[in-house]
Amino acid sequence: MNKLYSVALMCLIGINASKAVTTDAVTLVSAKVPSSKTSLSRTEAETFADTLRNISKQAYLAQYGQAWDDHLILKDSLRMPFSSRTIGERPADGYPIFISLHDIAGTTASVNDEQYQKQQHRYDQTLPASCIYITPRAPQNANDIWQKPALDSMLHTLVNLAVLNQGGNPNRVYLLGNMAGGDGVWHIATRQPDHWAAIATTGGHLEHLNIENLRNAPVMVLTVEDGGNDTARIETAKLCREMDKLQENDTEGYKHQCSSTGNNGKQLEVGEGKALDWLQQFTRNTIPQKVVWQQGETVTGSHYWLSVPATVTPQPGDKVTAEIDENIIRVSKCNYPELNIWLNDKMVDLDSPVTVIFDGKPVYKGKLPRKNSVIEESVFNRNDFGFYYCSKITLLIEVVK
C-alpha cells in the first residue's frame, strides 16, 4: 500500500514542541507563524546572539573552568585526564585544535598510561607551527572505551575549554586517533560529525558505522602496511570503497582520502605528517547546504541544522535527508513524527518567503520571524560557540498506511 504523508508545520517560537501539538494537529496541512511585530531584524538578531554567546561563555567557564586548570574532565563516575600544549602565536581566527586519541594496548592501567604518554609526543615533528594539541587519557582501560557515547560530551567540554582558555577556533577542531583510538574516532565522528572540521585515523577496526553521516566531515584514512593478514586493513579498504561510492553519487560531499604507510617510525612520521597537512585545509561548516542524518546503535537528538524535540525518541535506522537551495528547503526522507529545522540569515533570506517541500510536495511558503527565544534555545542548548539560529520550523508528520 502506498504511504500517504500528512504534514503539518508550525513555527514554534518560544514554546516547546510537545506543548504546541494537539491530538489532531498532525492531520492538518497548515502553518502557524507568529506576528511579524515580534520579529527581530537581522542586525538585532545577530547582536542578541553575540550577547548570549558571551553570557554562555562566562557561564561555561564558571561551571567547567577548573577542569582546564586541573587537566581533568569529569562525567558521572568517569575521570578523563588530559595533556595540552599551545604552540606558536595565535592566528587571527584562533588556534586550530587537534584532539589525539591514544591506542588501548591492554587492559591494565600501566600499559595504557604508557600509550597515553606516547600519544602526547606522537606528532612532535609534524604539528603545525601554531596549534593546540590535546591528548586525553582514556577514562577506562577497556579496549572499546573510546567508542562509548559518554565520551562525546567529555570531548565537547574539552574543546570548549580549549576555545575559552587558549583562544582555539571552534570551527577548526580536528579529531585524530590510532588503532583503538582510531576506532573511537570513527564512532565519535559518525555520531557527531557536526563537531569536527575533519577527522583522521591510523589503523583501527571499522564496524557498524553510519558513514553516510560524514557527508560534511572530511575523512583521512591512513592504513599501516605491516605485511600481515590484517583484518583492519581489509575493513579499511572496504570502507574506502564505500566512501568512494558515496562521493560518486554526491560529488559535493564525502570528501576523503585513503592512503597507506609503512610501519617503521620514519614512515609513520611521514604518513601522519601528510595526514595533518590534509586535515588543515578544512574548516567546519556548521550550516551545510545538504545533510544526511541516520541513527545508529547510539541515537542522537540533533545533526547540524536538524533536530528532534525531546518528546520524540529516535530509533536506530531512522533517517533524514534535507537540503537548502536558496529559499527552498527540501526534505526527501524523514522517519520522525516531528522534525525541527533551524535557520539563520546565512542559510536563507529571512526577509523573503521560505518554501518547504516535503516528499516532493510544497507544504509551506511564508516569511519566518527571527525570534529571541529561538536564539536562546540554539545558543544555550548546544553550548557550541560556532552555532547560532534565529528561526525554527517544526514539521509534524503522520504516516498513514
What are these regions (language model features)?
Residues 234-237, 244-329, 334-336:
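C-terminal catalytic histidine-bearing segment of alpha/beta-hydrolase fold enzymes
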Residues 182-193, 199:
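Short glycine-enriched nucleophile-adjacent loop
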Residues 225-255, 344-364:
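Active-site-adjacent alpha-helix of alpha/beta-hydrolase-fold enzymes
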Residues 20-95, 370-392, 399-401:
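A domain-start/cap signature at the N-terminus of enzymes
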Residues 94-164:
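Active-site machinery of serine-nucleophile hydrolases
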Residues 87-93, 143-179, 191-195:
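Gly/Ser-rich "nucleophile elbow"/oxyanion-hole loop immediately N-terminal to the catalytic nucleophile
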